[in-house]
C-alpha cells in the first residue's frame, strides 16, 4: 500500500519522516515522504541547523505528485509535526484532493503538541489549528493523553473519562483514535498503556514502563499503528503489533543507552512483532 507521509525531516537521528519511513517500509508499505522541516537533528539537542520548509514549497511538492497521477494510488496520508502554522492549510487541502481522487484513502493525523511532563512545546498557533482545522478531516488520530485532553476539553484521568474523551474526539470527525502514554489510577507504576478505539469497540494494551524518553518514539508509534490498521481496519490487531514493536525498540535503545532510537537495530522486531502483550477489550 502507498502512504504519503507529511512530516519533519532530520539528517542525523530519527524523528518525523526519519523515524516513520523505514518502519513503514519494513512492514511492507511504499512510502512517499514530503518534508515540512529540514534540520540537521531534532531540537531536543538545543542546537540544530536547517530551516522550516515554506508552505508553498511543500504544496509544490504535493502538486508535482498529483501531476504524476499519484493521488489515486495513495491509500493513506500520515502527518506529524507540522513546523509552520500554514502547513495545516496545505495538509487539509491535500487530504481533500487525494480523497477526491481515491475516496478509499484514509488520513491519519498525529496531533503533535506536547505531553503531560513538558506541556505544550509547539508554537501557540499550532494547537488550535490542529483542533479546529486538521483533526476534523482526519480518519485516524494518535494523540497522547495530554493531547487528547486539549483536543476535546475532556479530562482523561481514568477508564471512563478517557473513553468519554475518545468519544468526544470521534464526534469531531475521526473514526479511529489511538491514545498513547495512558495512565489510569489502576495502572501500575512500572507499566504504561495505550488505548485504541473505533466504531467496533475499544481495546487496551499494557506494556512495561521504561523510564527513558527518546524523541521520535511517538512518530514510530503513529506510523506503525497507521500502517498496520489500514490493511484490515482491525484496531485490536494494529494495537498489539504496534505495542510489541515499539516496546522492543525502546528496550533496545535503552539497553544501548543510545541518544537516538535504534531503528535499524530493531528492524526485525518492527517487521515481525513478537505480540507479547495481551490486548483487552474495554468497551
Swiss-Prot record:
Pfam families (UniProt xref):
Phos_pyr_kin (PF08543)
Alphabetically sorted, this entry's keywords are: ATP-binding, Kinase, Magnesium, Nucleotide-binding, Transferase
Enzyme's top EC category: transferase
List cellular component terms (GO): cytosol
Q: Which GO terms describe its molecular function?
A: ATP binding; magnesium ion binding; pyridoxal kinase activity
Q: Where does substrate bind?
A: 8, 219
Binding sites annotated in the UniProt record for ATP: 110, 147
Q: What's the cofactor?
A: Mg(2+)
> Which EC number(s) does UniProt give?
2.7.1.35
Pathway connected to this protein: Cofactor metabolism; pyridoxal 5'-phosphate salvage; pyridoxal 5'-phosphate from pyridoxal: step 1/1
Q: Which GO terms describe its biological process?
A: pyridoxal 5'-phosphate salvage
Reaction(s) catalysed by this chain, per the record, are: pyridoxal + ATP = pyridoxal 5'-phosphate + ADP + H(+)
Q: Which family does it belong to?
A: Belongs to the pyridoxine kinase family. PdxY subfamily.
| Its job | Pyridoxal kinase involved in the salvage pathway of pyridoxal 5'-phosphate (PLP). Catalyzes the phosphorylation of pyridoxal to PLP.
How it assembles, according to the record, is: Homodimer.
Protein name, entry field = Pyridoxal kinase PdxY
The record lists the lineage as:
Bacteria, Bacillati, Actinomycetota, Actinomycetes, Mycobacteriales
Amino acid at each position: 500500500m502507498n502512504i504519503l507521509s507529511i512530516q519533519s525531516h532530520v539528517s542525523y537521528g530519527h524523528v518525523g519522516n526519519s523515524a516513520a519511513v523505514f518502519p513503514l517500509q519494513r512492514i511492507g508499505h511504499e512510502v512517499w515522504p514530503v518534508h515540512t522541516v529540514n534540520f540537521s537533528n531534532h531540537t531536543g539537542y538545543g542546537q540544530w541547523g536547517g530551516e522550516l520548509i515554506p508552505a508553498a514549497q511543500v504544496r509544490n511538492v504535493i502538486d508535482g505528485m498529483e501531476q504524476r497521477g499519484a493521488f489515486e494510488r495513495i491509500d493513506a496520508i500520515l502527518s506529524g509535526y507540522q513546523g509552520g502554522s500554514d502547513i495545516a492549510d496545505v495538509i487539509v487541502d491535500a487530504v481533500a484532493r487525494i480523497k477526491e481522487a481515491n475516496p478509499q484513502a484514509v488520513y491519519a493525523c498525529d496531533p503533535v503538541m506536547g505531553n503531560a511532563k513538558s506541556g505544550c512545546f509547539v508554537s501557540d498557533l499550532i494547537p488550535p489549528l490542529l483542533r479546529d482545522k486538521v483533526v476534523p478531516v482526519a480518519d485516524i488520530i494518535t494523540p497522547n493523553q495530554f493531547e487528547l485532553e486539549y483536543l476535546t476539553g475532556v479530562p482523561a484521568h481514568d477508564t471512563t473519562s478517557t473513553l468519554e474523551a475518545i468519544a468526544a474526539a470521534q464526534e469531531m470527525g475521526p473514526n479511529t483514535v489511538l491514545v498513547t502514554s495512558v495512565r489510569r489510577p489502576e495502572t501500575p507504576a512500572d507499566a504504561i498503556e495505550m488505548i485504541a478505539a473505533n466504531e467496533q469497540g475499544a481495546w487496551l494494551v499494557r506494556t512495561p514502563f521504561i523510564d527513558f524518553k527518546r524523541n521520535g518514539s511517538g512518530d514510530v508509534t503513529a506510523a506503525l499503528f497507521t500502517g498496520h490498521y489500514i490493511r484490515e481496519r482491525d484496531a485490536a490487531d494494529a494495537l498489539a503489533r504496534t505495542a510489541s514493536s515499539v516496546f522492543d525498540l525502546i528496550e533496545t535503545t535503552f539497553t544501548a543507552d543510545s541518544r537516538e532510537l535504534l531503528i535499524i537495530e530493531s528492524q526485525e522486531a518492527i517487521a515481525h512483532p513478537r505480540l507479547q502483550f495481551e490486548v483487552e477489550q474495554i468497551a
